[in-house]
Amino acid sequence: MPHRKKKPFIEKKKAVSFHLVHRSQRDPLAADETAPQRVLLPTQKVNDEERRAEQRKYGVFFDDDYDYLQHLKEPSGPAELIPSTSFATPLCDKTEDPCVYSSTGIKLPSSVFASEFEEDVGLLNKAAPVSGPRLDFDPDIVAALDDDFDFDDPENLLEDDFILQANKPTGGERMDTESEEDDGHEWEDMDDEEGSDDRSSAGFLSDGGDLSAPGSPQEAMKKHLFWEEETKSRFTEYSMTSSVMRRNEQLTLHDERFEKFYEQYDDVEIGALDNAELEGTIQVDSNRLQEVLNDYYKEKAENCVKLSTLEPFEDQDLPTNELDESEKEETITVVLEEAKEKWDCESICSTYSNLYNHPQLIKYEPKPKQIHLSSKTGIPLNVLPKKGLTAKQVERMQMINGSDLPKVSTQPRSKDETKEDKRARKQAIKEERKERRVEKKANKLAFKLEKRRQEKELLNLKKNIEGLKL
């Protein structure tokens, strides 16, 4: 019966492989709980030779199956979906659930594949809060979000006709007289130049209005002066109005505290520098000078010790009439200096100790005994406890006969041996020698008899062998 070739269950040439990956965050179905969160991604077959040739262009010469070109692509570059030539794209209809691959005829539901249309921004980026200051927000809105907005303040409440009030033109306020006197010269020249230009070009205003009238552009320019609005702080040297958030009461309180703190470091508040030579005079009858002298005398008095306190008078118990009149008592004041404490080397080295240096006395430690290893076993010698006799050794000791024991002639002679012991020892040696001679003679005779017997056997064996030959 001919062998039939079995049809394979999967044809590799027509098969389609998929990767199970997570659904993209830009996919609209990512937020749908009923849709599966993992989708099938068709694999793209790439020729190994073409891939390796492409890798060699970029200096990658590894001969393996790993795709190193995926690390050379720009992660932020534009990506395009290119259909593979090995399989056809799934032909799915919006109304039909199953998708059909034309090359293989595989029918799979559309929910297992990614959506055809994707959003520009993913779900995670949409839900992520915006960190940092938002310049596009109104300061009042920022204050309200930060719970700094005072809803009870009547000024913060809007009127019913706030739109009409906002559109109503308002007259500009005039500048202060002090600022006009300080900064008016710079604007006077500009007024003259601009006035002359206006008169020369268009003449006076038809309605007889003045350039400096309230609401005019000139007045508005003077109102919003840069040096009038900007206020620099001591600790930043930057404008306080340049802050992103509006300064509420708490932030203003912090600013004032920092201002007070940095006022202490102004040039006027800083005192004399270190190591500065201070010169001056002091009166002779000054109380401060008297206190210094009293302290000096007290220190000297503490160092001085009277002789009477050191050596009491020996004859103080004698009556006064027994004392020699010729002898006169003389009081001598002896100044004794305190004995200086003598430090040893260890104490002196201890004064040099710090966080990293800890000096101490160097102790002499004897050199440890060298360990010798056994040449046979490699085990350290004289370390393990000595073992006793084994069972075999004990059995052999019990099997020893009297003949195996050492003879008297081989035993060492004692130095404290007496004449009787010497005589007995010599007699025992003679008997041992006599026994040895008898034993030796018997052994010789036994060897001779054995030799004769073996010679006879050899002779008979030779004769028998010769008789058997044909």
UniProtKB/Swiss-Prot annotation:
Give the originating organism: Mus musculus
- What is this protein's name? Protein LTV1 homolog
Q: Where are the Phosphoserine residues found in this chain?
A: S17, S24, S243, S326, S403
Ranges for region Disordered: 25-53, 162-222, 400-437
Q: Which domain of life is it from?
A: Eukaryota
Give the family this protein belongs to, as stated in its UniProt record: Belongs to the LTV1 family.
UniProt keywords, alphabetically = Coiled coil, Phosphoprotein, Ribosome biogenesis
InterPro entries documented for this protein = Ltv1
- Residue ranges, compositional bias (Acidic residues): 178-196
Q: Where is the composition biased (Basic and acidic residues)?
A: 413-437
Describe the task this protein carries out. Essential for ribosome biogenesis.
Stretches assigned to coiled coil: 414-470
Per the record, what is one GO cellular component?
nucleoplasm
Family annotation (Pfam families)? LTV
Key word Glycoprotein present in the record?
no
Q: Which GO terms describe its biological process?
A: ribosomal small subunit biogenesis; ribosome biogenesis
